[in-house]
Amino acid sequence: MAALKQLVQSAAKGSRAWLGSTVMALSCICASAQAQDLLVRNATVHTASARGSLQNADVLVQGGIIRAVGSGLSAPAGATVVEANGRPLTPALFGGITETGIEEVLVETSTVDSSLKMSDQPLRPEFDVTLAYNPASVLIPVTRLEGIGFTALGATPGGGFVAGQGGVMRLDGSIDPIGPRALFLRIGAAASELTGHSRAAQWMLLQQMIDEARGQVAADSPHALLTPAGRRALSRYLAGQGRIVVEVDRAADIRQLLRWATREKVKIAIAGASEAWQVAPELAAAHVPVFVDVLANLPASFDQIGATLENAARLQRAGVAVSFVQRGDATHNARKMRQLAGNAVANGLPWADGLAGLTRVPAQAFGVADQIGSIEPGKRADLVLWEGDPLDVAHYAEQVWLGGRAMPMRSRQTELRDRYLQRNAQP
Protein backbone atom coordinates (compact mmCIF):
# COMPACT_ATOMS: atom_id res chain seq x y z
CA MET A 1 0.00 0.00 0.00
CA ALA A 2 2.87 2.35 0.77
CA ALA A 3 4.32 1.74 -2.68
CA LEU A 4 0.93 2.41 -4.28
CA LYS A 5 0.56 5.64 -2.30
CA GLN A 6 4.01 6.75 -3.42
CA LEU A 7 3.12 5.96 -7.04
CA VAL A 8 -0.06 8.02 -6.86
CA GLN A 9 1.78 10.92 -5.26
CA SER A 10 4.38 10.77 -8.02
CA ALA A 11 1.62 10.90 -10.61
CA ALA A 12 0.12 13.94 -8.90
CA LYS A 13 3.44 15.74 -9.27
CA GLY A 14 3.38 15.50 -13.04
CA SER A 15 4.01 11.87 -13.99
CA ARG A 16 0.54 11.15 -15.34
CA ALA A 17 1.77 10.28 -18.83
CA TRP A 18 4.15 7.69 -17.42
CA LEU A 19 1.47 6.33 -15.08
CA GLY A 20 -1.05 6.08 -17.89
CA SER A 21 1.29 4.09 -20.11
CA THR A 22 2.23 1.80 -17.21
CA VAL A 23 -1.42 1.20 -16.40
CA MET A 24 -2.02 0.35 -20.07
CA ALA A 25 0.68 -2.28 -19.98
CA LEU A 26 -0.49 -3.67 -16.64
CA SER A 27 -4.09 -3.78 -17.83
CA CYS A 28 -3.02 -6.21 -20.54
CA ILE A 29 -1.37 -8.41 -17.91
CA CYS A 30 -4.50 -8.49 -15.76
CA ALA A 31 -6.99 -9.01 -18.59
CA SER A 32 -5.98 -12.46 -19.79
CA ALA A 33 -9.41 -13.85 -18.93
CA GLN A 34 -11.32 -11.04 -20.61
CA ALA A 35 -11.20 -12.22 -24.23
CA GLN A 36 -14.62 -11.71 -25.79
CA ASP A 37 -16.25 -13.38 -28.76
CA LEU A 38 -15.56 -11.36 -31.88
CA LEU A 39 -16.71 -11.34 -35.49
CA VAL A 40 -14.80 -9.25 -38.01
CA ARG A 41 -17.09 -8.99 -41.01
CA ASN A 42 -16.48 -8.18 -44.69
CA ALA A 43 -12.71 -7.79 -44.50
CA THR A 44 -10.01 -8.39 -47.07
CA VAL A 45 -8.44 -11.19 -45.06
CA HIS A 46 -4.76 -11.75 -45.80
CA THR A 47 -4.47 -15.13 -44.13
CA ALA A 48 -0.68 -15.60 -44.64
CA SER A 49 -1.58 -19.25 -45.22
CA ALA A 50 -2.15 -21.47 -48.25
CA ARG A 51 -5.60 -19.84 -48.65
CA GLY A 52 -3.98 -16.54 -49.56
CA SER A 53 -6.09 -13.39 -49.52
CA LEU A 54 -9.88 -13.62 -49.21
CA GLN A 55 -12.21 -10.85 -50.34
CA ASN A 56 -15.31 -9.92 -48.31
CA ALA A 57 -14.49 -12.58 -45.72
CA ASP A 58 -15.40 -12.95 -42.06
CA VAL A 59 -13.27 -14.13 -39.13
CA LEU A 60 -14.98 -15.58 -36.05
CA VAL A 61 -13.14 -15.56 -32.72
CA GLN A 62 -14.30 -17.40 -29.61
CA GLY A 63 -12.34 -17.78 -26.39
CA GLY A 64 -9.36 -16.00 -27.89
CA ILE A 65 -9.06 -18.57 -30.70
CA ILE A 66 -9.94 -18.24 -34.38
CA ARG A 67 -12.87 -20.62 -34.93
CA ALA A 68 -13.84 -19.96 -38.55
CA VAL A 69 -12.75 -18.02 -41.62
CA GLY A 70 -15.23 -17.63 -44.46
CA SER A 71 -18.20 -15.70 -45.79
CA GLY A 72 -21.57 -15.11 -44.19
CA LEU A 73 -20.55 -16.22 -40.70
CA SER A 74 -23.02 -15.61 -37.88
CA ALA A 75 -22.09 -13.79 -34.70
CA PRO A 76 -22.78 -15.69 -31.45
CA ALA A 77 -24.97 -13.99 -28.87
CA GLY A 78 -23.06 -11.25 -27.10
CA ALA A 79 -20.20 -11.17 -29.59
CA THR A 80 -18.59 -7.92 -30.66
CA VAL A 81 -19.14 -7.33 -34.39
CA VAL A 82 -16.66 -5.20 -36.32
CA GLU A 83 -17.62 -4.10 -39.83
CA ALA A 84 -14.40 -3.96 -41.83
CA ASN A 85 -15.98 -2.67 -45.05
CA GLY A 86 -13.29 -4.30 -47.16
CA ARG A 87 -10.31 -3.06 -45.15
CA PRO A 88 -7.29 -5.37 -44.75
CA LEU A 89 -7.15 -7.84 -41.86
CA THR A 90 -3.82 -9.57 -41.22
CA PRO A 91 -2.20 -11.66 -38.53
CA ALA A 92 -0.41 -9.57 -35.91
CA LEU A 93 3.04 -8.72 -37.24
CA PHE A 94 6.54 -9.78 -36.21
CA GLY A 95 8.61 -7.05 -34.56
CA GLY A 96 11.95 -8.58 -35.48
CA ILE A 97 14.75 -9.84 -33.25
CA THR A 98 14.74 -7.22 -30.51
CA GLU A 99 15.36 -6.47 -26.85
CA THR A 100 11.80 -5.23 -26.28
CA GLY A 101 11.06 -5.65 -22.59
CA ILE A 102 14.71 -6.17 -21.63
CA GLU A 103 15.98 -2.76 -22.74
CA GLU A 104 14.25 0.44 -21.73
CA VAL A 105 16.92 3.13 -22.18
CA LEU A 106 20.09 2.00 -23.94
CA VAL A 107 22.40 4.41 -22.13
CA GLU A 108 20.95 3.54 -18.70
CA THR A 109 22.60 0.21 -17.89
CA SER A 110 20.17 -0.62 -15.09
CA THR A 111 17.44 -1.02 -17.73
CA VAL A 112 19.45 -3.18 -20.15
CA ASP A 113 19.46 -6.96 -19.64
CA SER A 114 20.18 -8.25 -23.14
CA SER A 115 23.84 -9.24 -22.80
CA LEU A 116 26.21 -10.95 -20.40
CA LYS A 117 29.63 -9.43 -19.77
CA MET A 118 31.80 -11.94 -17.89
CA SER A 119 35.41 -11.77 -19.02
CA ASP A 120 36.50 -14.77 -16.96
CA GLN A 121 33.87 -17.12 -18.43
CA PRO A 122 32.38 -15.49 -21.54
CA LEU A 123 30.75 -18.53 -23.19
CA ARG A 124 27.48 -19.08 -21.36
CA PRO A 125 24.81 -20.55 -23.68
CA GLU A 126 22.60 -21.08 -20.63
CA PHE A 127 22.15 -17.30 -20.31
CA ASP A 128 18.41 -16.78 -21.00
CA VAL A 129 17.19 -13.20 -21.51
CA THR A 130 13.52 -14.18 -21.29
CA LEU A 131 13.95 -14.37 -17.51
CA ALA A 132 14.44 -10.58 -17.44
CA TYR A 133 11.45 -9.74 -19.64
CA ASN A 134 9.28 -6.88 -18.37
CA PRO A 135 5.74 -7.01 -19.83
CA ALA A 136 5.06 -3.53 -18.39
CA SER A 137 7.75 -1.90 -20.54
CA VAL A 138 6.55 1.39 -22.02
CA LEU A 139 8.05 0.28 -25.34
CA ILE A 140 5.44 -2.44 -25.74
CA PRO A 141 2.42 -0.16 -26.38
CA VAL A 142 4.58 1.94 -28.73
CA THR A 143 5.47 -1.16 -30.73
CA ARG A 144 1.99 -2.68 -30.62
CA LEU A 145 0.38 0.45 -32.08
CA GLU A 146 2.09 -0.41 -35.38
CA GLY A 147 0.31 -3.75 -35.63
CA ILE A 148 3.13 -5.74 -34.07
CA GLY A 149 2.00 -8.59 -31.85
CA PHE A 150 5.10 -10.69 -31.28
CA THR A 151 8.86 -10.39 -31.25
CA ALA A 152 11.84 -12.69 -30.96
CA LEU A 153 13.58 -11.65 -27.78
CA GLY A 154 17.26 -12.01 -28.64
CA ALA A 155 20.39 -12.14 -26.53
CA THR A 156 23.21 -9.92 -27.78
CA PRO A 157 26.95 -10.68 -27.51
CA GLY A 158 28.59 -9.27 -24.42
CA GLY A 159 31.87 -10.98 -23.63
CA GLY A 160 31.60 -13.85 -26.08
CA PHE A 161 30.39 -14.64 -29.58
CA VAL A 162 27.75 -16.97 -28.12
CA ALA A 163 25.23 -14.45 -26.84
CA GLY A 164 22.75 -16.73 -25.07
CA GLN A 165 19.13 -17.74 -25.40
CA GLY A 166 15.90 -15.93 -26.14
CA GLY A 167 12.41 -16.76 -27.29
CA VAL A 168 9.17 -15.51 -28.81
CA MET A 169 7.20 -13.06 -26.71
CA ARG A 170 3.62 -12.05 -27.50
CA LEU A 171 3.05 -8.39 -26.70
CA ASP A 172 -0.19 -8.98 -24.81
CA GLY A 173 1.19 -8.61 -21.29
CA SER A 174 2.23 -12.26 -20.96
CA ILE A 175 5.43 -12.78 -18.99
CA ASP A 176 6.41 -16.15 -20.46
CA PRO A 177 7.69 -16.93 -23.96
CA ILE A 178 5.84 -19.30 -26.25
CA GLY A 179 7.46 -22.17 -28.11
CA PRO A 180 11.04 -23.38 -27.80
CA ARG A 181 14.01 -21.21 -26.89
CA ALA A 182 16.46 -20.01 -29.55
CA LEU A 183 20.23 -19.70 -29.18
CA PHE A 184 21.89 -16.59 -30.60
CA LEU A 185 25.48 -16.31 -31.76
CA ARG A 186 27.60 -14.21 -34.09
CA ILE A 187 30.06 -15.33 -36.77
CA GLY A 188 32.39 -13.26 -38.93
CA ALA A 189 34.11 -9.92 -38.61
CA ALA A 190 31.52 -8.59 -36.17
CA ALA A 191 32.62 -11.27 -33.67
CA SER A 192 36.35 -10.93 -34.32
CA GLU A 193 37.20 -9.01 -31.15
CA LEU A 194 35.37 -11.64 -29.09
CA THR A 195 37.33 -14.55 -30.57
CA GLY A 196 40.99 -13.62 -30.77
CA HIS A 197 40.61 -11.67 -34.03
CA SER A 198 40.17 -14.75 -36.22
CA ARG A 199 37.23 -16.46 -37.90
CA ALA A 200 39.13 -19.73 -37.58
CA ALA A 201 39.05 -19.29 -33.80
CA GLN A 202 35.27 -18.97 -33.92
CA TRP A 203 34.91 -22.39 -35.49
CA MET A 204 37.56 -23.84 -33.15
CA LEU A 205 35.72 -22.59 -30.06
CA LEU A 206 32.34 -23.65 -31.40
CA GLN A 207 33.61 -27.17 -32.06
CA GLN A 208 35.06 -27.48 -28.56
CA MET A 209 31.75 -26.34 -27.09
CA ILE A 210 29.97 -29.06 -29.06
CA ASP A 211 32.48 -31.67 -27.94
CA GLU A 212 31.91 -30.64 -24.32
CA ALA A 213 28.13 -30.76 -24.67
CA ARG A 214 28.44 -34.28 -26.06
CA GLY A 215 30.62 -35.39 -23.16
CA GLN A 216 33.83 -35.71 -25.14
CA VAL A 217 35.68 -33.31 -22.81
CA ALA A 218 35.77 -33.93 -19.07
CA ALA A 219 33.68 -31.46 -17.10
CA ASP A 220 36.58 -30.83 -14.73
CA SER A 221 39.11 -30.29 -17.52
CA PRO A 222 41.17 -27.12 -16.94
CA HIS A 223 40.54 -26.31 -20.60
CA ALA A 224 36.73 -26.62 -20.42
CA LEU A 225 34.79 -23.68 -21.86
CA LEU A 226 31.32 -24.47 -20.54
CA THR A 227 29.68 -24.87 -17.15
CA PRO A 228 27.55 -27.98 -16.53
CA ALA A 229 24.46 -25.82 -17.12
CA GLY A 230 25.97 -24.55 -20.37
CA ARG A 231 26.57 -28.11 -21.55
CA ARG A 232 22.97 -29.04 -20.83
CA ALA A 233 21.67 -25.95 -22.62
CA LEU A 234 23.77 -26.52 -25.74
CA SER A 235 22.92 -30.23 -25.83
CA ARG A 236 19.24 -29.36 -26.30
CA TYR A 237 20.02 -27.52 -29.54
CA LEU A 238 22.24 -30.36 -30.70
CA ALA A 239 19.19 -32.59 -30.19
CA GLY A 240 17.06 -30.32 -32.39
CA GLN A 241 15.09 -28.75 -29.52
CA GLY A 242 15.27 -25.16 -30.74
CA ARG A 243 16.87 -23.11 -33.47
CA ILE A 244 20.33 -21.56 -33.49
CA VAL A 245 20.15 -18.04 -34.94
CA VAL A 246 23.47 -16.89 -36.37
CA GLU A 247 24.22 -13.29 -37.25
CA VAL A 248 26.49 -13.55 -40.28
CA ASP A 249 26.99 -11.62 -43.52
CA ARG A 250 29.85 -12.90 -45.69
CA ALA A 251 29.02 -15.56 -48.26
CA ALA A 252 32.10 -17.63 -47.37
CA ASP A 253 31.09 -17.67 -43.70
CA ILE A 254 27.52 -18.66 -44.61
CA ARG A 255 28.83 -21.60 -46.64
CA GLN A 256 30.99 -22.69 -43.71
CA LEU A 257 27.97 -22.37 -41.43
CA LEU A 258 25.85 -24.55 -43.72
CA ARG A 259 28.55 -27.25 -43.72
CA TRP A 260 28.73 -27.08 -39.93
CA ALA A 261 24.94 -27.29 -39.50
CA THR A 262 24.75 -30.29 -41.83
CA ARG A 263 27.59 -32.06 -40.04
CA GLU A 264 26.19 -31.43 -36.56
CA LYS A 265 22.53 -31.90 -37.58
CA VAL A 266 21.32 -28.67 -35.99
CA LYS A 267 18.55 -26.29 -37.03
CA ILE A 268 19.85 -22.85 -37.92
CA ALA A 269 18.57 -19.51 -39.15
CA ILE A 270 20.64 -16.64 -40.50
CA ALA A 271 20.23 -13.00 -39.49
CA GLY A 272 21.71 -9.98 -41.25
CA ALA A 273 22.79 -12.01 -44.26
CA SER A 274 24.08 -9.23 -46.53
CA GLU A 275 25.64 -11.68 -49.00
CA ALA A 276 23.11 -14.49 -48.53
CA TRP A 277 21.82 -14.07 -52.09
CA GLN A 278 25.17 -15.43 -53.32
CA VAL A 279 24.46 -18.66 -51.44
CA ALA A 280 20.73 -18.80 -52.17
CA PRO A 281 20.56 -22.28 -53.78
CA GLU A 282 22.42 -23.86 -50.86
CA LEU A 283 20.22 -22.07 -48.31
CA ALA A 284 17.08 -23.22 -50.10
CA ALA A 285 18.31 -26.82 -50.29
CA ALA A 286 19.08 -26.80 -46.56
CA HIS A 287 15.69 -25.19 -45.69
CA VAL A 288 17.39 -22.42 -43.72
CA PRO A 289 15.23 -19.33 -43.07
CA VAL A 290 16.96 -15.99 -43.54
CA PHE A 291 16.23 -12.77 -41.66
CA VAL A 292 17.37 -10.05 -44.05
CA ASP A 293 18.46 -6.55 -43.11
CA VAL A 294 16.70 -5.12 -46.15
CA LEU A 295 18.11 -1.61 -45.94
CA ALA A 296 21.74 -2.78 -45.68
CA ASN A 297 22.56 -2.04 -49.31
CA LEU A 298 25.99 -0.50 -48.73
CA PRO A 299 29.14 -2.29 -47.51
CA ALA A 300 29.48 -1.20 -43.89
CA SER A 301 32.30 -3.77 -43.59
CA PHE A 302 34.30 -6.11 -45.79
CA ASP A 303 31.77 -8.82 -44.88
CA GLN A 304 29.06 -6.81 -46.70
CA ILE A 305 30.72 -6.00 -50.02
CA GLY A 306 27.97 -7.90 -51.87
CA ALA A 307 25.09 -6.07 -50.14
CA THR A 308 22.11 -5.24 -52.34
CA LEU A 309 18.53 -4.00 -51.99
CA GLU A 310 17.47 -7.04 -54.03
CA ASN A 311 18.76 -9.51 -51.44
CA ALA A 312 15.31 -10.59 -50.22
CA ALA A 313 13.87 -10.89 -53.74
CA ARG A 314 16.78 -13.01 -54.97
CA LEU A 315 16.54 -15.31 -51.98
CA GLN A 316 12.78 -15.71 -52.45
CA ARG A 317 13.18 -16.58 -56.13
CA ALA A 318 15.60 -19.33 -55.12
CA GLY A 319 13.05 -20.79 -52.71
CA VAL A 320 14.42 -19.45 -49.42
CA ALA A 321 12.01 -18.54 -46.61
CA VAL A 322 12.61 -14.82 -46.04
CA SER A 323 11.86 -12.66 -43.02
CA PHE A 324 13.33 -9.38 -41.84
CA VAL A 325 15.63 -7.99 -39.18
CA GLN A 326 16.96 -4.57 -38.24
CA ARG A 327 20.43 -3.86 -37.00
CA GLY A 328 21.09 -0.85 -34.87
CA ASP A 329 18.28 0.29 -32.62
CA ALA A 330 15.85 -2.47 -33.53
CA THR A 331 14.13 -2.33 -30.15
CA HIS A 332 13.04 1.30 -30.21
CA ASN A 333 12.37 1.14 -33.94
CA ALA A 334 10.50 -2.15 -34.18
CA ARG A 335 7.73 -0.18 -35.88
CA LYS A 336 10.00 0.11 -38.92
CA MET A 337 9.58 -3.58 -39.73
CA ARG A 338 6.71 -2.74 -42.08
CA GLN A 339 9.01 -0.33 -43.89
CA LEU A 340 11.61 -3.07 -44.34
CA ALA A 341 9.02 -5.38 -45.85
CA GLY A 342 7.74 -2.58 -48.07
CA ASN A 343 11.25 -1.79 -49.30
CA ALA A 344 11.81 -5.45 -50.09
CA VAL A 345 8.58 -5.47 -52.12
CA ALA A 346 9.67 -2.30 -53.92
CA ASN A 347 12.84 -4.16 -54.92
CA GLY A 348 11.24 -7.27 -56.33
CA LEU A 349 9.86 -9.35 -53.46
CA PRO A 350 6.22 -10.36 -54.13
CA TRP A 351 3.74 -8.59 -51.84
CA ALA A 352 2.44 -11.84 -50.38
CA ASP A 353 5.98 -12.88 -49.48
CA GLY A 354 6.55 -9.49 -47.88
CA LEU A 355 3.57 -10.09 -45.60
CA ALA A 356 4.64 -13.70 -44.98
CA GLY A 357 8.03 -12.39 -43.86
CA LEU A 358 6.24 -10.42 -41.15
CA THR A 359 3.92 -13.24 -40.09
CA ARG A 360 4.13 -16.88 -41.12
CA VAL A 361 7.86 -17.19 -41.85
CA PRO A 362 9.16 -15.96 -38.46
CA ALA A 363 6.50 -18.00 -36.67
CA GLN A 364 7.68 -21.11 -38.51
CA ALA A 365 11.35 -20.31 -37.97
CA PHE A 366 10.90 -20.01 -34.20
CA GLY A 367 8.61 -23.02 -33.87
CA VAL A 368 5.37 -21.22 -32.97
CA ALA A 369 3.46 -21.47 -36.26
CA ASP A 370 0.99 -23.84 -34.60
CA GLN A 371 -0.14 -20.88 -32.49
CA ILE A 372 0.43 -17.62 -34.40
CA GLY A 373 1.55 -16.22 -37.76
CA SER A 374 -1.53 -16.89 -39.90
CA ILE A 375 -5.30 -16.50 -39.84
CA GLU A 376 -6.56 -20.07 -39.60
CA PRO A 377 -9.01 -21.93 -37.37
CA GLY A 378 -7.32 -23.12 -34.20
CA LYS A 379 -4.72 -20.34 -34.09
CA ARG A 380 -4.62 -17.59 -31.49
CA ALA A 381 -6.72 -14.61 -32.52
CA ASP A 382 -3.79 -12.21 -32.94
CA LEU A 383 -5.22 -9.91 -35.60
CA VAL A 384 -4.80 -6.41 -37.01
CA LEU A 385 -7.38 -4.36 -38.91
CA TRP A 386 -5.67 -1.81 -41.15
CA GLU A 387 -6.76 1.51 -42.59
CA GLY A 388 -4.87 0.62 -45.80
CA ASP A 389 -1.96 -1.42 -47.16
CA PRO A 390 -0.04 -2.78 -44.14
CA LEU A 391 3.24 -2.68 -46.09
CA ASP A 392 2.84 1.02 -46.86
CA VAL A 393 3.99 3.24 -43.99
CA ALA A 394 1.51 5.93 -45.06
CA HIS A 395 -1.23 3.68 -43.64
CA TYR A 396 -1.81 2.58 -40.06
CA ALA A 397 -3.33 -0.06 -37.82
CA GLU A 398 -6.87 0.79 -36.73
CA GLN A 399 -7.19 -1.99 -34.15
CA VAL A 400 -4.99 -4.75 -32.78
CA TRP A 401 -6.43 -7.84 -31.10
CA LEU A 402 -4.20 -10.28 -29.22
CA GLY A 403 -5.86 -13.47 -28.09
CA GLY A 404 -9.16 -11.92 -29.15
CA ARG A 405 -8.71 -8.95 -26.79
CA ALA A 406 -8.75 -5.44 -28.20
CA MET A 407 -5.47 -3.78 -27.29
CA PRO A 408 -5.42 -0.09 -26.23
CA MET A 409 -4.48 1.92 -29.33
CA ARG A 410 -2.44 4.45 -27.42
CA SER A 411 0.99 4.72 -25.82
CA ARG A 412 3.03 7.07 -23.70
CA GLN A 413 4.09 8.83 -26.89
CA THR A 414 0.53 9.43 -28.08
CA GLU A 415 -0.52 10.63 -24.63
CA LEU A 416 2.34 13.14 -24.54
CA ARG A 417 1.41 14.24 -28.05
CA ASP A 418 -2.20 14.79 -27.08
CA ARG A 419 -1.22 16.66 -23.94
CA TYR A 420 1.08 19.12 -25.66
CA LEU A 421 -1.22 19.70 -28.60
CA GLN A 422 -3.38 21.57 -26.11
CA ARG A 423 -2.80 25.30 -25.83
CA ASN A 424 -1.03 26.32 -22.60
CA ALA A 425 -0.34 22.70 -21.67
CA GLN A 426 1.97 22.35 -18.67
CA PRO A 427 4.51 19.57 -18.04
Description of each model-found segment:
Residues M1-G14:
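N-terminal secretory signal peptides that target proteins for export/translocation
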Residues W18-C30:
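Bacterial N-terminal signal peptides
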Residues V45, S49-T90:
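Histidine-rich, glycine-flanked metal-binding segment
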Residues V105-L106, D113-S119, E126, R243, ...:
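His/Asp/Glu-enriched, well-ordered alpha-helical/loop segment
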